[in-house]
Curated annotation (Swiss-Prot):
[4Fe-4S] cluster binds at residues 53, 57, 60. Signal peptide: none annotated. It comes from Vibrio atlanticus (strain LGP32) (Vibrio splendidus (strain Mel32)). This is Biotin synthase. Keywords: 2Fe-2S, 4Fe-4S, Biotin biosynthesis, Iron, Iron-sulfur, Metal-binding, S-adenosyl-L-methionine, Transferase. InterPro entries: Aldolase_TIM (IPR013785), BATS_dom (IPR010722), Biotin_synth/BioAB (IPR002684), Biotin_synthase (IPR024177), Elp3/MiaA/NifB-like_rSAM (IPR006638), rSAM (IPR007197).
Length: 350
């Protein structure tokens, strides 16, 4: 099967209408052709700035527009981020993702963010950030610091998007992905299933992702986690087989990408997760929380992997020890040189 960038909604609809077992078989064949089977990459996600986001994404408990139980927090200290990254590495993660509830980072944020990247890289982990929209210069600055992946989801189809978010446009999201790609970083971009979208909208999301000039290296498929206080708290649940089908179709359409089984796993039983892995999912977030929503704990995931005979990816080749120590020393020196803790870790929500 060739890698394509010219998919249509009609083609995706045709895949959705296939018998379930036939679709699963096709996805598994593609998966084994392009990916290492029985292998799952493990990432950890940390919220480095939580709550009070000015965006109005209707699914998000961190939005300042809704009354939820999420408290706003300041930008996390670099030392705390590095401590969390070390714990994630010790638990088996190979990629450390850092998320901030912003519309976009301000220039005052950039030195702290680049220190986080360099410190985590110094541990031998891959790095990923999700910070909202980026300018070309900001993308270049993150890339120069060594950021491997940047996450910026499309969320849904262009047609349904305006029903979910009004504070940034679909084109804003596509522009940020272009800036990230132009800066030389890898892209993590996917969407959310279960927000009341139609079958055509689900197909349209996958078409948008698969028809990018280069497929995202990582495609997170999230199942909506309904949070009290958001406009999405009472939407209907996603039918399990429908969700698994979308994992399979993402694998078929983007065969070289990692398809990440992302938010919503806490609400999936072992059998549903196993079907998702069979359908081509080969990446998960590891740890008890995704930003502010629950996630299965590490022991539960390892038990499931053992039952299924799945191997989690081990930490990639460690950087040269001298280089690692130099990177960490540079970060510590820069942090120590800054005036005061209060000056450095301002309230990033203002």
């Amino acid at each position: 099967m060739e890698v394509r960038h010219d998919w249509t909604v009609a083609e995706v609809r045709a895949l959705l209408e296939k018998p379930f077992m036939d679709l699963m078989f096709e996805a598994q064949v593609v998966h084994r052709q392009y990916q290492e089977h029985n292998h799952v990459q493990v990432s950890t996600l940390l919220s480095i700035k939580t709550g009070a986001c000015p965006e109005d994404c209707k699914y998000c408990p961190q939005s300042a527009h809704y009354r939820t139980d999420v408290d706003k927090e300041r930008l996390m200290e670099v030392e705390r981020v590095l401590d969390a990254a070390q714990k994630a590495k010790n638990a088996g993660s190979t990629r450390f993702c850092m998320g901030a509830a912003w519309k976009n980072p301000k220039e005052r944020d950039m030195p702290h963010l680049t220190d986080m990247i360099k410190g985590v890289k110094g541990m031998g982990l891959e790095t990923c950030m999700t910070l909202g929209m980026l300018t070309p210069d900001q993308a270049g600055e993150l890339a120069d610091a060594g950021l491997d992946y940047y996450n910026h989801n499309l969320d849904t189809s262009p047609e349904f998007y305006g029903s979910i978010i009004t504070t940034r446009t679909y084109q804003d999201r596509l522009d940020t992905l272009s800036h990230v790609r132009d800066a030389g970083m890898k892209i993590c971009s996917g969407g959310i299933i279960g927000m009341g979208e139609s079958t055509n909208d689900r197909a349209g999301l996958l078409v948008e992702l698969a028809n990018l000039p280069v497929h995202p290296e990582s495609v997170p498929i999230n199942m909506l986690v309904k949070v009290k206080g958001t406009p999405m708290e009472n939407v209907d649940d996603v039918e399990s087989f429908d969700f698994v089908k979308l994992i399979a179709i993402a694998r078929i359409m983007m065969p070289m990408s990692a398809v990440r089984l992302s938010a919503g796993r806490e609400n999936m039983n072992e059998q549903m997760q196993a079907m998702c892995f069979m359908a081509g999912a080969n990446s998960i977030f590891y740890g008890c929380k995704l930003l502010t929503t629950p996630n299965p704990d590490e022991d539960t995931d390892m038990q499931l992997f053992k039952k299924l005979g799945i191997n989690s990816q081990q930490v990639a080749q460690k950087p040269d020890e001298i280089q690692e120590n130099e990177l960490l020393d540079q970060v510590v020196e820069r942090v120590a040189a800054r005036p005061t803790k209060d000056d450095m870790f301002y309230d990033a929500t203002v």
